[in-house]
Regions:
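SAM-dependent nucleic-acid methyltransferase catalytic core
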Residues: 59-86, 93, 138-246, 250-257, ...
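Short metal-binding segments enriched for Cys and/or His
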Residues: 27-46
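Long, positively charged, glycine-interspersed low-complexity recognition regions
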Residues: 265-326
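Short linker/helix segments within small regulatory modules
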Residues: 12-22
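Residues immediately within or flanking Cys/His clusters that coordinate Zn2+
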Residues: 1, 22, 49
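Short cysteine-rich clusters marking metal-coordination/redox-active sites
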Residues: 1-4, 25-28
Length: 326
């Protein structure tokens, strides 16, 4: 085994993959390819490093891109709108369907759709508020905008929105969507489970939000919104070579503080295990790009054959870097 070094006396001691190109180790459950085997696997993992902690691993090339980063109405923690120029070289020039199993603000998918580089996009999120928002943008556009038209961006409106998000069960879709939008716009960094932003009085901009929502709604025939477990979505859409899976799960180190639907250690391991199983056992299907925070855990989870890791810089609040605007 190339991972743990275990030696086996015969093939009866190992589990060969269905294509006969390698085997699964019974000791560490990792995959080892046979010598001389080349696989058609299109899997890249982007590990985000802090702007003040990139050192020699950081690759800061500036890339010209046709992808716009300010299309989503949402402010989203970990959103990829500011990183599109860095991620763009790893995206397909054109794809039939782009799928985001952890949609969030959906900045990457919207950029690909509006640039004409994706024919359709699939936005999935398990967070009830996020799902309600995107389904309302497409199906109940004017109802959603009417629900927030008279919002002034006050602390009381923010707290009421948070109360709705804390108890989403049984809420009408548009009510939940409006609450999510209000909390997202007024919260610190768009974190709806956090406190209100210090400059909340200036955060609410109905015209900008309405313009972006209506622009997205114009593409409703090319956007599918789902509310499923992300692993099920990955399994469903992996098998088509004309699909692009952009997998942007909750951060490992701060996920619980940032998201209402976060991942525990076992969840991160299951996700990495599924991606490993699909790409190694059934290569040549969908293109996959995974984004994560750079840390020892993610380095370990994605330490398997044929994965192309690259490091990108994200600006965080710190003493030596300046954040860009939302």
């Amino acid at each position: 085994c190339r991972v743990c070094g275990a030696i086996f006396a015969s093939q009866d001691d190992i589990e060969e993959d269905v294509h006969g190109t390698g085997f699964w180790c019974p000791e560490c459950e990792r995959f080892t390819p046979y010598a001389g085997i080349t696989r058609i696997i299109d899997l890249s993992v982007c590990l985000e490093t802090k702007a003040c902690d990139c050192r020699e691993r950081q690759m800061d090339e500036q890339v010209k891109s046709d992808l716009q980063g300010r299309l989503s109405p949402l402010r989203y923690p970990g959103g990829k709108g500011k990183m599109l120029k860095q991620l763009e070289p790893h995206f397909p020039e054109h794809i039939g369907t782009m799928v985001e199993p952890f949609a969030g603000g959906a900045a990457a998918s919207l950029a690909m759709l509006f640039a004409g580089r994706a024919d359709r996009i699939v936005l999935n999120d398990l967070d009830p508020g996020v799902y309600a928002f995107w389904i309302s943008v497409l199906k109940y556009t004017e109802e959603l905008l009417n629900a927030v038209h008279n919002i002034q961006g006050t602390r009381e409106e923010f707290l009421q929105a948070k109360r709705i998000l804390d108890r989403p069960d049984g809420r009408p879709t548009v009510e939940l969507a409006a609450a999510f939008l209000i909390a997202n716009q007024l919260a610190f960094s768009g974190i709806t489970k956090a406190g209100i932003a210090g400059d909340y009085e200036r955060r609410w901009n109905y015209k900008k939000v309405a313009d972006r929502i209506r622009r997205i709604a114009a593409y409703k025939d090319r956007i599918t919104v789902m509310h499923m477990d992300a692993l099920q979505v990955i399994e469903e859409f992996y098998w088509n070579a004309d699909h692009f899976l952009f997998i942007d799960p909750p951060y490992v180190l701060q996920g619980k503080q940032l998201y209402r639907e976060w991942y525990e250690t076992d969840d991160h391991k299951r996700l990495a295990g599924l991606i490993q199983d699909l790409t190694l056992s059934y290569p040549g299907c969908a293109k996959i790009v995974v984004t994560y925070d750079a840390c020892p855990e993610t380095e370990e989870y994605y330490d398997f054959p044929y994965v192309g890791k690259f490091y990108k810089q994200r600006n965080y609040s710190c003493g030596c870097s300046r954040n860009t605007k939302d």
